[in-house]
Amino acid sequence: ILVNAAVDGEQLSDDEILYETLLILIGGDETTRHTLSGGTEQLLRHRDQWEQLVADAALIPGAMEEMLRWTSPVKNMCRMATADTEFHGTALREGDKMMLLFESANFDEAVFGDPENFRIDRNPNSHVAFGFGTHFCLGNQLARLELSTMTRKILQRLPDLRLADDTRLPLRPANFVSGLEKMPVVFTPIKPVLA
C-alpha cells in the first residue's frame, strides 16, 4: 500500500515509506505490548482488582482504560507552535517547538484527583494515552480491542497469575516508547488449548 501510495499526485520517497513503516510497527505493536505488560503488572500488584476482573469480565473496559492511563506507553510527542501564543505564563513564538509529556498529563492531580492510585473503576478516565485533537491515534480502537481480548484471555487461562517476587521490574531504556524489560511470573499450568 505504501509503495503505491501518493500524496498530491506524488509517490512517497523511500525514506517516507521507511518512516511510515516504522511508525506503523512502533504504534501498532510496541505501544500495545507495553500497555499489556505494564497494566498486567499493576493488576498483579493490586491483587484485589485482579480478583475482581477474574470474577467479572464486564470490568475489563474500565481496567483497560486505567492500564492505558497508568502505562502511558508513548512518553512524549513534540509539537510546533503555529502562531504566537502564551501557555501558562510562558510566551511561545510561531515555530517554537515544545515537548508534550503524556505521562505527566495522565498523572495530573487537577484531572485525576488521586493519580498515584491504580483504580480500574476510575470514571471518568480522561487519559491522553492516544494523544488528542488532530493527532489522536488512528489505531485506538484496534489497540483497545487487542488489549481487552488479551486481558480477557490472560484472566481466563491464568487466574492465579502472580509476580515471581516484589522487586521493582526493570524498564526498557527509551525516551519515546517505553515499557517493561521483563516480568517474571508464576502460575499454575492448565491443559493446553491445542493438545
Per-range role (PLM):
Residues 1-195:
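Cytochrome P450
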